[in-house]
Amino acid sequence: MTEQLMTMTRIGILLTRVAQTLTVALCAATVTASAAGSGADWPAFGGDPGGSQHSPLAQINKGNVKQLKLAWQHRSGDFIDAPSPKGSLLQVTPLHANGTLYFCTPLNRVFALDPASGKERWVFDPHRPDPRTDRAALSPPLVMASRCRGVAYWQEDNAGNDKGPCRKRIFKNGESSRVYALDADTGILCADFGAAKGHPGWASHADYENHGEGLMASSTSPPVVLGDLVIAAMSVNDGIANAKDGIVRAFDVRSGELRWEFNPIPPEYRNVSGAANVWSTISVDPQRNLVFLPTTSPSTDYYGGGRRFDIPLANAIVALDGATGRVVWSRQVVRHDLFDYDLVGHPVLVDIRRGGKTVPAALLQTKMGWLFGFDRSTGDPLWPIVERVVPKSDVPGEMAAATQPVPEGMAPFARQELRREDLFGLTPLDRYACQKKFDELRYEGMYTPPSIRGSILFPSALGGGNWGGAAYDPASNLLLVKAENLATVIKVVAKKDAREDQAPPKDYLTRSLVGTPYRMEGELFQSPLGIPCTPTPWGTLTALDL
């Protein structure tokens, strides 16, 4: 659930809002050039089904980028100006398909724009409660949905059968764990989708069984299309021991009928643990008919004393058979997660050059700053993975994993170690305060587990890498990855009584871990001035030679 944590840093909010303005201006110019030039589309969140995030367009380059001018701006008005986490964030990647620009807003509306002019062609409003005027809408399920990262596009591929209503569709994860199907030309709900369940125009995870307690909401990330399936994941409240299971479901793109579902939690443990969901994006390989999932930690975050058993499909890259939803292969990259090291960003599915051969790769960037690479047909590692001994937990009832998997032969793309002498401060006093705090807390390098006294987690749940993912350049065989270098302080505190489970969370890092003996208290590792103690740069862009 680090998507909530991402909003907690003031620096992150500032950079996000500045980037929003720049992105609208630059993308407007880019789309105009595309429409007038090569006509190249961007029909999926990552540009293509495998999520390479690479465009072949060459009209805009480093020689003329400074000459770009604003072509048009569009303002939806869907903005909640409130302190985190109640404020909205514009995090969307628009799609360019069907001669139209499609995107969603933090308040769940979908817009279709003319790419050349920015004029609205249609707007879909699911009549979601408006948090700006409806106090009930500020409850956690809707607060955490006040962002939308994209939609999915599908069209009939049968020759001569691509005309008429809903032959081209936009799919969107919506409130109350729904998946909407819209006519891409008009924005009208496709009445055949979901009709069998009594709600024409949308399918719902809520129609199907899910063990556990707490929140089950639609993912802020878009669904993904593979053939005649739309595949959708969900977000859950992983601060509850017996949370909802992180089930991924595939629906028929036309009827909305359930075709298969995947549950990462073993049946024998579904009454004691949950989550391991996919809140980030999913990638697919149409040629091999494979679905690639980046799963998250099982519940609860930061304390796993109630799940001292193996959940191999949590914190794992999982390849599913697109026809059945069965696991073809999986590789877990975090053992017994106590750090909120959810897998974030879709696995990038590209053919890379390595050892003189072309290899079908699935590349996984992680919060830890490691890049894992696998053969996407077999799951075999493309470079060695070793087990490294890591620090033990001193929290009563907890048992941290003895080792963690570490890739060898590929340099990390993020800072992975803190040293006292490198800590940052705007002034000598500021720096001294960071060093004093460092001395008081537990820190034994990467994978230092949460503690009673308080531990520094670095890389933190912010990353390293995060949901923006990575981009591959086929010409240079380089993978470009952005990273954040911010630490957090996590402390687990014994509860006085069960009533603490009923208290509303202060924020994502200060809350009860429901169903456990503990609550957690956390904050960014920062100085009294609110400046990160971690040394600069706090954000990087790294190119890795594959």
Question: What is the predicted role of each segment?
Answer:
Residues M1-T16:
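N-terminal secretory signal peptides that target proteins for export/translocation
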Residues R17-T30:
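Bacterial N-terminal signal peptides
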Residues V31-A35:
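Sec/Tat signal peptide C-region and signal peptidase I cleavage site
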Residues W42-G46, K86-R109, P140-R178, L215-I240, ...:
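Repeat-blade elements of multi-bladed beta-propeller folds
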